[in-house]
From Swiss-Prot:
Catalyzes the ATP-dependent phosphorylation of L-homoserine to L-homoserine phosphate. The keyword Kinase applies. Its EC number is 2.7.1.39. This is Homoserine kinase. Belongs to the GHMP kinase family. Homoserine kinase subfamily. HAMAP family: Homoser_kinase. The gene is thrB. It catalyses: L-homoserine + ATP = O-phospho-L-homoserine + ADP + H(+). It comes from Prochlorococcus marinus (strain NATL1A). GO terms for cellular component: cytoplasm. PANTHER family: HOMOSERINE KINASE, HOMOSERINE/4-DIPHOSPHOCYTIDYL-2-C-METHYL-D-ERYTHRITOL KINASE. Its main location: cytoplasm. It is found in: Cytoplasm. One of its GO terms (molecular function) is ATP binding. InterPro entries: GHMP_kinase_C_dom, GHMP_kinase_C_sf, GHMP_kinase_N_dom, GHMP_knse_ATP-bd_CS, Homoserine_kinase, Ribosomal_Su5_D2-typ_SF, Ribsml_uS5_D2-typ_fold_subgr.
Length: 315
């Protein structure tokens, strides 16, 4: 297939994600109904030209150029497919705030993959895009649900290949995500984790993950409450989130079934019945306010479609 023509434009929407969801460290993630929109255009210039236009003050620190995640993902698609690379412009309507534990980096990677694949005439199947996304990100729990939607478990098999399973999520269970004004980088959140963990902690997490998945499948409140329990990463990370433990306890007191750090944080995920959503949201915001941190806590639903190319036109 030939390279995209100058002026060709695609529009890609990519959902936010909440990863880990308590015990599913680096393997469990869910797409949520808050999305970034990327308008991607072939422009004149050599293949190393990449212009990034952010339509949000949240993204003012982000830059174009060859090190940009979006650009790197687009280049991987074209190299893999044998398509001549081209200069690009990406205009981003940013709804997913960076460095908050909602998969903002994953949206950039997925948008680069999906957008470049669309511009080139879809030479690569979605399975290949999944493989590339995991390789670029380094772990699957955000990029997989961001690409395909839903609640996803991703595991590496004994033959060193990735297997993805989409799991059921009962529609009566909603997610309240408290998003603070403070930031926390994934690299910082990973630095505090130990290199080795006790076997007993791993066993506890295996059991908790099983309970959580069954609870989400059936809507069983007790199973969800017992399953939202982690020993692998959260004990080391709560100390990085100002007021985080108080927000967690406030959410539970207001009716949340369980709470977890969303991804690497600092956002906090609470699972609850829809009827408890407003109470949980208000309680989390007030608890963070008491700690001197501004926040918002929208009630979210599972996003089932994943990333979508909603337009492919010539300018």
């Amino acid at each position: 297939m030939g390279p995209p023509k100058i002026g060709q434009t695609v529009v890609v929407e990519v959902p936010s994600t909440t990863a880990n969801i308590g015990p599913g460290f680096d393997c469990l993630g869910a797409a949520l109904d808050l999305s970034n929109q990327f308008t991607i255009k072939r422009i004149e210039g050599n293949a190393e030209r990449f212009e990034l236009i952010m339509e949000s003050t949240e993204g003012n620190h982000l830059r174009g150029g060859p090190e940009n995640l979006f650009y790197r993902a687009a280049q991987r698609v074209w190299r893999t497919a044998g398509v001549e690379p081209v200069a690009l412009e990406a205009r981003v309507k940013l709804a997913v705030p960076p460095a908050r534990g909602l998969g903002s980096s994953a949206t950039a990677i997925v948008a680069g993959l999906v957008g470049a694949n669309a511009l080139a005439g879809y030479p690569l199947p979605k399975e290949k895009l999944l493989e590339l996304a995991i390789d670029i990100e380094g772990h699957p729990d955000n990029v997989v649900p961001s690409l395909i939607g839903g609640l996803c478990v991703t595991a590496k098999t004994a033959t060193d290949r990735w297997r993805v399973v989409r799991c059921d999520w009962d529609q009566s269970i909603k997610a309240v995500v408290a998003i603070p004004s403070i930031r926390l980088s994934t690299s910082e959140a990973r630095r505090v984790m130990p290199e080795n963990i006790p076997v007993n902690d791993a066993v506890i997490n295996l059991g908790a993950l099983t309970l959580l998945l069954q609870g989400l499948r059936t809507g069983n409140e007790d199973l969800i409450a017992d399953g939202m329990h982690d020993k692998l990463h959260e004990p080391y990370r709560w100390g990085l989130i100002k007021g985080g433990l108080e927000v967690r306890e406030a959410a539970k007191a207001a009716g949340a079934l369980g709470c977890a750090i969303s991804g690497a944080g600092p956002s906090i995920l609470a699972l609850c019945k829809a009827t408890k959503g407003r109470e949980v949201s208000v309680a989390m915001v007030k608890a963070w306010e008491a700690a001197g941190v501004a926040s918002r806590a929208p009630l979210m639903s599972l996003q089932l479609t994943g990333s979508e190319c909603i337009s492919n036109t010539f300018g």
